[in-house]
Design a protein with these regions (language model features):
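RNA-contacting regions in translation and RNA-metabolism proteins
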Residues: 1-378
Length: 378
């Protein structure tokens, strides 16, 4: 009978620096050690199989107590006459020299040479940890800014692309700061930004990407106006006054509908502030953009009439079906109601959600002429 074959167990890779790094990641960045160790195991397994393409099954054993890693190639125990694949099979007689308990169909773990495994583990472990740090930082930045969606943040202009006019902003501080790009289409027309300038922006969305979180910001979004009013008007911040809707053409004019359930509170007066100070501060921040504050009404006709300010309204006739209406205004205020290049009517339509057909008081249309909702308001 053959003597039992002594197969030396691998001493394993004593890599305390890897374990220490994983402990640091868990403590300081909140990344579980088990999560990172799984990534290291996956990386070293992939690397070994890349160098040994014929090997099918490899496992890595983690000895946390002694801070060691051990790698084994798994081989199936087969009969002598069926033995054809030395990379993935071991004859039963050879297996029994390792341990008499092995039978055909069992799996034997064959230790991988320490020197080779050490080279693979050290290199791949380091790369995984570096990548883990990057992912942790990206994750922290994403979590930080994802919680600030639809909020206002202040950024510092760091660069302006002379070709696209896109503005790079540094938002946040320290490890949780990141670059955000203010595209030309999200900039207020006519507004000139310069490097070093502090700028308030509205966070439209935060997305994950392979290069880190992408923060989509805007200076033209109606949400910027709403958040600015929340900062300036305590009654909006605490919910006493509610912003019902906003229509905006950035850099030119905004219409905002407000309402309060408290009959003792004037929602328009609260937004304007003493001597107009509150609204003036927002106009300054928006570089002179005009702001019309409208009192919202659950009666569509009243709301539409108010939305067409500063024009007076004689009558509002609602369509029987759909969201459309015809508004009659004094002849001498037709141009005022429509506004320059149709802006006043356009903003009123967006604010109310109704298609508005404006006619002068001298309009001679048929009394029963149908009001048609021809197209949705954009």
């Amino acid at each position: 009978m053959k003597g039992k074959k002594k197969v030396k167990e691998p001493a394993g890779m004593n890599i305390p620096e890897i374990f220490a790094a994983l402990a640091m990641l868990e403590k300081e960045r909140g990344i579980p050690q088990t999560f990172m160790m799984d990534k290291i195991i996956q990386a070293v397994t992939t690397a070994y199989k890349r160098d040994h393409k014929d090997v099918e099954n490899v496992i890595v054993d983690v000895d946390e107590e002694h801070q060691r890693l051990k790698m084994y190639v798994q081989k199936n125990v087969v009969a002598e006459e069926d033995y054809v694949d030395p990379f993935n099979e071991i004859p039963v007689e050879e297996a029994k020299t390792i341990s008499a308990r092995y039978e055909i169909g069992d799996v034997v773990n064959i230790p991988v040479d320490n020197t080779e495994f050490g080279r693979i583990a050290a290199g791949n472990g380091k790369q995984v940890i570096i990548q883990g740090l990057r992912e942790a930082e990206r994750g922290m930045v994403y979590d930080e800014f994802n919680s600030k969606q639809h909020e206002i943040l202040t950024g510092v202009v760091t660069r302006i692309d002379p070709r696209t006019n896109a503005v790079s902003l540094r938002i946040g501080t320290g490890t949780e700061s990141t670059e955000a790009l203010l595209l030309s289409g999200e900039q207020v027309p006519g507004e000139e930004l310069v490097e070093g300038q502090h700028v308030k922006v509205y966070v439209v969305d935060v997305r994950r990407s392979t290069r880190g979180p992408q923060i989509l910001i805007s200076r033209t979004h109606p949400g910027l106006v709403k958040r600015l009013f929340e900062l300036e008007v305590p009654e909006i911040y605490n919910g006493t006054v509610e912003v019902k809707s906003i229509a905006r053409e950035a850099g030119s004019r905004t219409k905002m509908a407000v309402w309060s359930a408290d009959e003792n509170v004037d929602p328009i007066g609260a937004c304007v502030g003493p001597k107009g100070q509150r609204v003036a501060a927002i106009v300054d921040e928006l570089r002179g953009e005009k702001i019309d504050i409208i009192k919202w009404s659950e009666d569509p006709a009243q709301f539409i009439a108010a939305a067409l300010a500063p024009s007076d309204v004689v009558d509002v006739m609602m369509a029987e079906e759909g969201k459309a209406c015809r508004v009659i205004v004094p002849d001498d205020q037709l141009s005022l109601a429509i506004g320059k290049e149709g802006q006043n009517a356009r903003l009123a339509a967006r604010l109310t959600g109704y298609k508005i057909d404006i006619k002068p008081e001298s309009y001679q249309g048929e009394d029963d002429e149908e009001i048609v909702d021809e197209e949705p308001v954009q």
